[in-house]
Amino acid sequence: MSAHPVDTVTAATATPDVAQPFKELGLKDDEYARIKEILGRRPTEAELAMYSVMWSEHCSYKSSKVHLKYFGETTTDEMRSSMLAGIGENAGVVDIGDGWAVTFKVESHNHPSYVEPYQGAATGVGGIVRDIMAMGARPIAVMDQLRFGAADAPDTRRVVDGVVRGVGGYGNSLGLPNVGGETVFDESYAGNPLVNALCAGAMRVEDLHLAFASGAGNKIILFGARTGLDGIGGVSVLASETFDGDESGTGRKKLPAVQVGDPFTEKVLIECCLELYAAKLVVGIQDLGGAGLSCATSELAAAGDGGMHINLEQVPMRATGMTAAEVLSSESQERMCAVVTPDNVDAFMEVCKKWDVLATVIGEVTDGERLTISWHGETVVDVPPRTVAHEGPVYERPVQRPASQDALVANTTAGLTRPESADELKATLLKMLASPALCSRKWITEQYDRYVRGNTVLAENADSGVIRVDEKTGRGIALATDASGRYTALDPYAGAQLALAEAFRNVAVTGATPKAVSNCLNFGSPEDPGVMWQFQQAVRGLADGCAKLGIPVTGGNVSFYNQTGSTPILPTPVVAVLGVIDDVHRRIPTGLGLEPGETLILLGDTRDEFDGSIWSQVEHGHLGGVPPKVDLEREQLLADILLAASRDGLVSAAHDLSEGGLAQTVVEAALAGETGCRILLPDDADPFVTLFSESSGRVLVAVPRTEETRFTGMCTARNLPWVRIGVVDEGSDSVEVQGQFSVSLAELRTTFEGTLPALFG
């Protein structure tokens, strides 16, 4: 027991005027006053710790909640028809047919990944994996969305090295394939990288588990790793003191607020959980992530039909002298909290013993309505659990379109110098291919295991990851994540829809049917009205887009305060789309050359759209104007045609067009298939626009000559624009833009793949 005096509920009642460090814990004056109003007294030290972490921006969504409700308002009953769990649960769950369900979610671990890149990224992966485990599923794949400062900035190498090793080290050790994602370099992320991790899990529909504590007398069991000092206050400012200072005269060094992960403990925990689920030993379950036991106990109790009592001294600790507040606030990793009936406790413990997982009964469900916590026989917490978990402050922050937005939009690319000659076009292609914005991410992805477990069908560098779920039928899923901070900065509403459209298209390109969306909304300070305008517009754009496409948002995450000083990051709404494919054997790959003499057909309209483009960034360091037009009805039509083409075997390869335009897509497809091709520019087309425009809603498909008439006839009949843009020449070792230039595959590969190893290898 800590030598620190215990602040009990009795003591708090008797000493109402004791000064408390609520501001140091991130609480405002009015929030502290509200806590005292709820309790009818001042909070104890332990209660104050609980409220401070649970009412933090990260846990309470206090600045975003008024806007996030728009997702629910725009979701129809039809959209919800295949959704088994949605917003408010640990992760969304979707019925994918044949008795299977898939759960998926994106979470952020941004700030810890700057302070301690390896552990920040590793525990970001570990945390999202436990969210998936808590739904009753076996985790089957991970993805990541990474944002770093300028590639040549002094500190970027440190952050990139740690984050990539952290993502790979944790995911690889768990035996989870990393099937895709994005990595972006931009100076706005210097000092504030983004690490957004996605995990997907699969289960039978009847195996779904939810987080609630029900049934008076049922036991609360904490199992997994011991509880330590690492991660205290990771979601608030509980660890705001300097890391090397002495803490409270205890003689202990204060550890950073970044958690420390052990993937091998988590791997065993996964198998233990799955056996517990199979044996029907779990009533309710919650992982311990942000806010630790404060979150797990209050959320379980708030979602149940009674109260809860916890004997906090029963929590297994790996540090001596911890206080009750520290135990409640610790974010030590690899821990779960389960609700178990008394007659199943012994069987539960036997399963944990089999897997060498430490498990301890720390409390029970009560027939009251309060969450009480004792510490060595004295009550240190006595609260209504909903006030901790769900009834925190809600702010309607000022929303104001920035005055600078007009100038940003007016600053178009119209006056920028464009390449005209064949040599200039070739030089532009090679410069863009070699740029950190577009170069190969192979140096990163090769540090991840993409095919472990044997169910990965497509992974990086495909447009989406495709994973088999059912070995017997071949049923599987496709996952894609996308975001564009540049487009969102120009128009947050359109930028969010462009990210949605691309992720939707990336799933459709593989032959899968898009079914559901998760998101991770990364923005600057909510106290800035301009940032809140960006956030509001992005939420509305994403919600309206999902409604138009008929797919629901099943959950997500909001990360605010992503800025250095007063300069926010580019607004970055990350969108993840889950698709279903009834047989992974009919998936459409990216690489050319599967069929000799394939015809290359470009689907969709190409317009002169360069505002916010990678070309404007790489060639001119420019950001301004209006982002490309979004046509979600066209995206749906495109998806329908790709699905039909996949089922009928009409296309042998497909790759979506996005950053870098047609030129980038052709090079990636040619290198993936190790096959050259000829690009035939339309006579009336501007070569620069054709090659580098970033118009949305376009896909390059390779069609066997025997199927060309059927495929183009289907497109014409459904009013989808198409143009025959090239041919795959058997045995060709170059990409030729007829009438302009030719580049060998060897030069393209060297140019494309050499940048990141030179910078970070």
Curated annotation (Swiss-Prot):
Active site residues per record: 58, 109 (proton acceptor)
Positions contributing to ATP binding: 61, 105, 519, 556
Recorded catalytic activity of this chain's protein: N(2)-formyl-N(1)-(5-phospho-beta-D-ribosyl)glycinamide + L-glutamine + ATP + H2O = 2-formamido-N(1)-(5-O-phospho-beta-D-ribosyl)acetamidine + L-glutamate + ADP + phosphate + H(+)
An individual GO BP term: 'de novo' IMP biosynthetic process
EC number: 6.3.5.3
Annotated pathway: Purine metabolism; IMP biosynthesis via de novo pathway; 5-amino-1-(5-phospho-D-ribosyl)imidazole from N(2)-formyl-N(1)-(5-phospho-D-ribosyl)glycinamide: step 1/2
Superkingdom assignment: Bacteria
Coiled coil: none
EC top class, as a word: ligase
UniProt: Mg(2+) 2 binding residues: 131, 287
Binding site for Mg(2+) 1: 107, 557
Any Pfam family: AIRS
GO cellular component labels: cytoplasm
Localization in the cell: Cytoplasm
Residues annotated to bind substrate: 108-111, 130, 259, 331-333, 559
Free-text function comment from the UniProt entry: Part of the phosphoribosylformylglycinamidine synthase complex involved in the purines biosynthetic pathway. Catalyzes the ATP-dependent conversion of formylglycinamide ribonucleotide (FGAR) and glutamine to yield formylglycinamidine ribonucleotide (FGAM) and glutamate. The FGAM synthase complex is composed of three subunits. PurQ produces an ammonia molecule by converting glutamine to glutamate. PurL transfers the ammonia molecule to FGAR to form FGAM in an ATP-dependent manner.
Record text on subunit structure and interactions: Monomer. Part of the FGAM synthase complex composed of 1 PurL, 1 PurQ and 2 PurS subunits.
Stated family: Belongs to the FGAMS family.
Protein name per Swiss-Prot or TrEMBL: Phosphoribosylformylglycinamidine synthase subunit PurL
Lineage: Bacteria, Bacillati, Actinomycetota, Actinomycetes, Mycobacteriales
